[in-house]
Amino acid sequence: MPITKEEKQKVIQEFARFPGDTGSTEVQVALLTLRINRLSEHLKVHKKDHHSHRGLLMMVGQRRRLLRYLQREDPERYRALIEKLGIRG
């Protein structure tokens, strides 16, 4: 199931650093995490959907790069973000 406009706005509002912020690293990572979680659920049902699996791997790689950047530039924001998202177990 695709992400609705309302769900996307909710995530943006929750992770925005200031009003109108849609492109900060935190927002990008949060949106990618939402998409990754949705696609993971899809792949549990449709195990042979290799095309979507490749898309999942690409999204995970993009999120990894963004998180690496954030950790390098501002470790405190990085730690707060991973705790809020519940990733990096």
From Swiss-Prot:
Superkingdom as given in the UniProt entry: Bacteria
A Pfam family matched in the record: Ribosomal_S15
GO molecular function: rRNA binding; structural constituent of ribosome
Keywords annotated in UniProt: Ribonucleoprotein, Ribosomal protein, RNA-binding, rRNA-binding
PROSITE patterns found in the cross-reference section: RIBOSOMAL_S15 (PS00362)
GO cellular component: cytosolic small ribosomal subunit
Family per record: Belongs to the universal ribosomal protein uS15 family.
Name of this protein: Small ribosomal subunit protein uS15
Organism: Thermus thermophilus (strain ATCC 27634 / DSM 579 / HB8)
